[in-house]
């Protein structure tokens, strides 16, 4: 059975992180490049936002006995295959997972343009993910 309390905590964390990073959502590329503290705050917050999404996905995948993902990006593909999230959101989250891998393993090569683009265009995708997870959990309750 899906642990709704665990998922609820993770969804609340996503809200908290989105509020925190929202202060940077209108930053210019030049402002971002010039401030290493902002870079670290944004990179780390994006990292833990993505981790929270992956944690939720892995919990659902395990509980529902879906196929095991081959990596972080594939986690979202498994959710799409099982109709938890749609194709467009899946593709966006796969890119986010690959970005997460760069932040964690190749941090010296982070492209500031990509980070600022995420800030400007993709923060709302985390909200879409939250809504999809809540909808999925609700549909699972309706089946009982």
Task: Name the predicted role of every residue range.
Residues 1-144:
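Solvent-exposed interaction patches of small proteins and small membrane subunits
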């Amino acid at each position: 059975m899906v642990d709704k309390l665990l998922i609820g905590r993770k969804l609340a964390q996503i809200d908290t992180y989105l509020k925190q990073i929202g202060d940077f959502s209108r930053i210019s590329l030049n402002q971002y490049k010039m401030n290493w503290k902002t870079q670290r705050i944004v990179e780390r917050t994006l990292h833990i936002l993505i981790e929270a999404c992956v944690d939720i996905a892995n919990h659902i995948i395990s509980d529902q006995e879906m196929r095991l993902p081959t990596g972080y990006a594939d986690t979202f593909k498994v959710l799409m295959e099982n109709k938890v999230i749609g194709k467009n959101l899946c593709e966006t989250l796969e890119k986010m997972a690959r970005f997460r891998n760069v932040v964690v393993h190749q941090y010296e090569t982070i492209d500031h343009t990509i980070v600022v683009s995420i800030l400007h265009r993709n923060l709302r995708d985390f909200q879409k993910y939250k809504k999809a997870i809540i909808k999925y959990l609700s549909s699972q309750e309706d089946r009982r």
